[in-house]
Amino acid sequence: MMGMMSQGGSKGPDPASADDPSVQMGRFFPPMEHLSPEEKTEAMERAFERLKTSMDMLAKPDGTQKAPAKNCQALKTNHPSKPSGNYWIDPNGMDAKDAIMAYCDMQTGATCIQPKPAMSHEITIMSDDKEAWVGEIDTNAFDINYKADSNQMNFLQLASSSAEQTITFHCKDTVAHLNRANNKRHAVSLMAWNDLEIKHRGKARYQVLSDECQHKKRSWAQTVFKVQSRKPARLPIVDVQVQDFGRSNQAFKIEVGQVCFS
């Protein structure tokens, strides 16, 4: 190997060099023909350390942009001492260039993707329609997006066994779940990633953590919905349907929580 590493006098590239491992190793091992034996030993030790670090990064990616982990559970397994925080992940494992940023809960190993944006503008719908999907209204539409493309999201779903997310409905004189009569005639619906409609009833239903909107106050209040599923393909939420609107004093905003996969 020392003989191969000390060669360097040829002019122009050798057509076979791209397939020669010794040439590729030059990234780690510097030219040594002018070094003393002691300097060669030191250079070799440093080069082997760089090579070892590089191999470790391939075997156990550390969540940096150059070495994204498959997901946060893999990062937790390989680097259990890392704190919770933002890390780079590459669920499809194809190329670090399409890696995405995720929040890793290092206590649970959950991988959380952030919405983009997290809060809608204030929306008032002046229409005689009985229901409306917020992403499809003629004016003031709000598109729910996330900081991950569909390909990475799908691979993340495939590698997970459960997912959860919260949606907070900020309301002004607008019902979100129960109304004053204590029925759910105007309850919102949520559109899942896989086009399943998640409602207050049925097999695919949401939880209601709090419901201030029932009182139809003219000041801002909020209702918090939570979706938990052992079918990760359902999340994240991509649209919200409202049913209580049509007056100028009614308004709402939608706050989209991060979606977490485990």
Where are the model-predicted features located?
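Mature extracellular or lumenal effector domains of secreted proteins
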Residues: M1-S262
